[in-house]
Amino acid sequence: MTYKEARVYLDEMSKYGSVLGLDTIRGLLRELGNPQDDLKFIHIAGTNGKGSVLAYTSTILSEAGYRTGRYVSPTVISYLERIQIDGTWIPEDEFAELTENVKEAIARMEAAGEESPTVFEAETAIAFLYFKKKKCDLVVLESGLGGILDATNIIGAPVCAAFATISVDHLGVIGDSLEEIAQNKAGIIKPGCAVVSAKQKENVREILKKTAEEKGCPFTEAQSEQMMIFEDSYHGITFSYKEYEKMHSPLAGQCQRENLATALEVIRCLNRQGYRITEAQVREGLSKTRWTGRFTCLSESPLFFVDGAHNEDAALKLKVTVERYFSDYKKIFIMGVFKDKEYEKITSILCPLAESIYTVSLPNKERTLPAEKLAEVVKKHCQKVKAEQTIETAVEDARKEAMTQGKDIAQKTVILACGSLSYLGEVQRIVLNNRQ
C-alpha cells in the first residue's frame, strides 16, 4: 500500500461519519495485539487549550530526553502532523505500512460479522502501532470528542489525566449542559492516575474533583493567578510560576497563561512520580514550543495572525488578546465558520473589533456556513464586509487594504484570520508563499 492509497482508504472510511463508543476500537486493537497496553500516556481532554497544553508538555518531555509521542486532532498544516514523535511527523511510508495492517485487521473483523471501525478509530490504532514500534517512553494523547466514549479512552490508566479549560461545545453530542459535558470529559479519569486541571468554573471543578476522589486519584488545580508576568506581547510571554522562574513561551494570547500553568503542573506531577525533568529542560522546552493556529504570527509587515477560536469561550479570550495587543491598530479580519458552531455568538464577540471583514467558505463544503450567509450575519456588527469567492482572494484583499495607505499605516494595521482551525493551514501557505 502506498501513502496515496492509504489516504484514499481512510477518506472512504470518513464518509461513514463517527460513532461514540469503545466496543469497535476494542475489537480493532485486539486484532492488532493491543499495542496501547505497552505504552504510557498523558491523556488530555478539554474544550479550549488542550492542544497548547499538549504542545508544551510534549516539547518539554522531548527536551528532557524522553521519546515522546503526540496524537492530535484536528491538524492545521498536514494530515500527517496528527502522529508525531519528538516533534517529527510520521513518515509517509510508515503511515502506509501501518494503515495496511489496520486495513487487514478491519477485514478480519468484518468477516467475523463485527461492526466496522470509524476513521478516527483507525487513525488512533495507527498511532498506537507507530508509538509502540518506535518504543516511545511517553505518549501525550489528545482526546477527540468528549472523554468517556472517545476512542482514545480505550487506554488503561494514564500516568496523568489533564484537563484544559472546559466550556460549552458539541452541545447535544457529548452533553446538553456544561455539567454534562464536564462529566463526559471526566471519563478519562481512571483509578491509579494523577489528575491535573486548568482553573475551571466552580461547577466543572467540583465534577472533576469529585470524580478524582471517587477513583482514588490525587487532584491538582493549576493556579495561574500565582503566575508573575514580566513581559506579555504578541511575541510571547515571559513569566515565573512557582519554582519555574523567568521562563519564556513564544506562544502569545490571553489563554496561554492558563495553558502554561496547566502544562507546568503536569510536569510537576510527573516529577513527583519519579520522572526527572529539570528546570533547565523546562525552560528550553517552553522556548522551543510551537503550535500553529493558536494566535500565530505569519507576517510582520503587515502584521498577520491566525487563530482557531471557534466557540464562545475561545472567542472571548481572543477578544481580550486583540484588545490588549492591538488597541490602537486598524483591525482587518478574515473569517470562516462551520454552520454547526456558535457562529452567532462568535461574530457578536469578535466582529465589533474590526474595521473590515472578509468572509470565506471553509474547505469542508458539508459543514461550512457559506461566505455569503456569514457576511449577512457579520453585517450586524461591522459595516464593511465582503464575501469572498476563495480563501486566497480574501488574503489578497486583506493584505491590499492593509498596505494601501503606505508603509507607516501598514505597521499599525493587523490582519487576523479566525473562526475555525480548518482553513488556517491554507491561509498560512498563501501568506508564506507571498513572502518568498
Where are the regions that the model predicts?
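Beta-strand->loop->alpha-helix junctions that form or flank phosphate-binding loops
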Residues: 72, 198-199, 211-232, 250-254, ...
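ATP-dependent carboxylate-amine ligase catalytic core
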Residues: 29, 34-37, 63-156
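Short functional linear segments
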Residues: 1-46, 52-66, 70-71, 107-115
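Acidic, Mg2+-coordinating active-site environments of NTP-dependent enzymes
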Residues: 109-112, 134-142, 158-246, 260, ...
